[in-house]
């Protein structure tokens, strides 16, 4: 699956892209490739185990404290992409990076995700997967 998204600066030559293969090969249950081509001047930390949440391995958005992509020790993977075209982002909303950190810390089954909370975030696409299931979630409207 490939999820291209225009970056906020409106440059059509730059896209945020994610490609992943889930349960496509017995040796590698999940393969992920992507780029975070959102705001090059936004401070980030590279992929690492988080000290305060040592079950989490992810990059870190140093501005909001969340992450755009990560994996937990239990094998849960999550990635969020911004969804553009619904007006300017509202800065008072909860950071979309909190979705990923919350879902990676959660031990409930993926089927129990509470989508009623999604309205607190600016528009997003979210992919969450573990060994048993993979989910695509979004709070945007229209085709993906």
Q: Where is each model-derived feature located?
A:
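N-terminal nucleophile
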Residues: 2-3, 10-144
């Amino acid at each position: 699956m490939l999820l291209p998204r225009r970056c906020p600066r409106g440059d059509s030559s730059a896209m945020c892209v994610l490609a992943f293969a889930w349960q496509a090969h017995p040796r590698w249950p999940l393969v992920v490739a992507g780029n975070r081509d959102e705001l090059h001047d936004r401070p980030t930390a590279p992929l690492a185990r988080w000290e305060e949440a040592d079950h989490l391995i992810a990059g870190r958005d140093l501005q909001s404290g969340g992450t755009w992509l990560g994996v937990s020790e239990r094998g849960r993977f999550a990635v969020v992409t911004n969804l553009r075209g619904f007006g300017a982002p509202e800065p008072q909303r909860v950071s979309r990076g909190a979705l990923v950190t919350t879902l990676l810390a959660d031990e409930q089954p993926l089927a129990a995700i509470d989508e009623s909370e999604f309205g607190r975030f600016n528009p997003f696409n979210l992919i969450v997967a573990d060994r048993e299931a993979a989910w695509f979630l979004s709070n945007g409207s229209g085709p993906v």
